[in-house]
Curated annotation (Swiss-Prot):
GO terms for biological process: ribosomal small subunit assembly; translation. One of its GO terms (cellular component) is small ribosomal subunit. The keyword Ribosomal protein applies. Belongs to the universal ribosomal protein uS19 family. Pfam families: Ribosomal_S19. It comes from the Bacteria. SUPFAM superfamilies: Ribosomal protein S19 (SSF54570). Protein S19 forms a complex with S13 that binds strongly to the 16S ribosomal RNA. The lineage of its organism: Bacteria, Bacillati, Bacillota, Bacilli, Bacillales. The keyword RNA-binding applies. This is Small ribosomal subunit protein uS19. Keywords: Ribonucleoprotein, Ribosomal protein, RNA-binding, rRNA-binding.
Length: 92
């Protein structure tokens, strides 16, 4: 179910404060965050945010196309290694 329009998009306060400081200082630093639920705002464009995937921080460079999406969409939590080959062939 989608979020109500009257509420507006969600961003964690600590992440928004960090990004506002970066924009004001005009620096290009990597910002570490655990907030996968935060929505990407237009102010984030051009910055790199390291999003936690449960094991490590994955650097995500924010582009125009990402605005409105959640940070967690760009840091997958599960790694698919493919199905294992059948062992019957190797035993012979």
């Amino acid at each position: 179910m989608a979020r109500s329009l009257k509420k507006g998009p969600f961003v964690d306060d600590h992440l928004m404060n960090k990004m506002e400081k970066l924009v004001a200082s005009e620096q290009k630093q990597v910002v570490k965050t655990w907030s996968r639920r935060s929505t990407i705002f237009p102010q984030f464009i051009g910055h790199t945010i390291a999003v936690y995937d449960g094991r490590k921080h994955v650097p995500v460079y924010i582009t125009e196309d990402m605005v409105g999406h959640k940070l967690g969409e760009f840091a997958p939590t599960r790694t698919y290694k493919g199905h294992l080959a059948d062992d019957k062939k190797t035993r012979r």
